[in-house]
Amino acid sequence: MTDIQPDEPLLHQGGSARLRVHARGDEQEVDLDRDAPFGWWPAIAIALVAFIDRVEINLIAGALPVIQDHFGFSDTVGGLIPTAASIAAAVLLLPAGRLADRAPRVGTIVIVVLVWSLCSVLSGLATTFLMFFMVRIAIGAAGQLYNPPASSLLADYYPNRSRGKAYGFERAGYYMGLPAGVIIGGAVAEALDWRAVFFIAAVPGLFIAALMLTVKEPVRGLGDTIDRLRAQRTGVAPPESEAHVDLSVSSASLWADAKELLRIRTLRGVILAQAMLALGVAGLFYWLPTFLERLEDLDTDTASGLAGGVGGTGIVIGIIIGSRLGDRHESEGWRIRLSTVCLLVGAIGLSLAVLLPGVGLRMAMVALACAGFAGAMPNLTAAAANVVPAASRGMGFALLQFLTTLGGAFGPLLVGAMSDVTGWIGYGMLFLIPPLFLSVVLLWLVRGSYDADAARASASSSH
């Protein structure tokens, strides 16, 4: 495990300080005036990892009608594929969080990306539906394992001032991968064959794994150290708290660590809200091309292209606006309040996308929904990082991703099952809406605890 900074570095004149930045390296001069003292490459590299993860997971959504025709399975079984994969991922997430707090994070991420590429090739080689189903479970299980080490690494490279933008890069890659996977899956399946979809997608994974090796392992707690040094310059030190939660890395059980983290009220709210959000988003992106194909009489290629292109545009807009607004203001509970508004916009947009007839109206509302969801995500991720002490961020993000993954697991299955029961896929899409409004309520209830929880986390990181 990489140690947290053992001694508080001294400030130099001119707004710089010497401190150890990398796990294997000497001290170096750090400019405290820069928003991102170590540049944006670590965030970009992790964004590429998040992108290829979601591309490989969502290829099946774009090619789903063709794959259904080949293997002959129902909508319920189609929805069960991502559900089973997500449950498998959830089982591994808490151990992955423990690993992220103890093992080199860069190396862990590289191995995970290589496993994705291998599973993508195996998907294309499957000769029976059972083989295909099992490989998709494997890639789903591996798909979420990059998140705890990647999120922990970003929190160390980027102090609070730039943390929202850093997570914005990662969330942008993640959410752009959703429509990109849908578009690629639909286009390649229509032009070539559904097997070619998975063979082609394996190649970028190898390239991104090599790029990730250029990122050096940072010292744990580095971002928090920079925040404390900046506070010293202004004469306003981060407040200490008597209500200290001991979350240092120990030999405690996974469940004991998780229970300790869930004492943080803001984290509980963020986790539950993201779980409800994930249910809606997972169901939306998985079934949207099929929804458009059946209700608007579009072909597979056109439906996938519209779903991915319009959704991707909304995501880009939401990420840019959300991350900039989140980092710009520091008023009480700002990130949580901003996220609440963004999720409300997204929930309303998705409701109208399902209810309003016509391709143009539906796609305009899909863009609005995606912009709202994407605007919330970097701020929720940054808020989670800010309320969890540095030594336990890997476990904290694993817990967040664990429950979020479980929430998202049932979105595609819910839509598919309701489609089979009612005979109309629109009813299944309507069932995604109540959880989204519930996520808005959950965030609103914890908005007042964010600043106190962030202060306690900062105090814990300094011990």
Model-found features: residue ranges?
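Helix-loop-helix hairpin linking two adjacent transmembrane segments in secondary transporters
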Residues: 170, 174-220
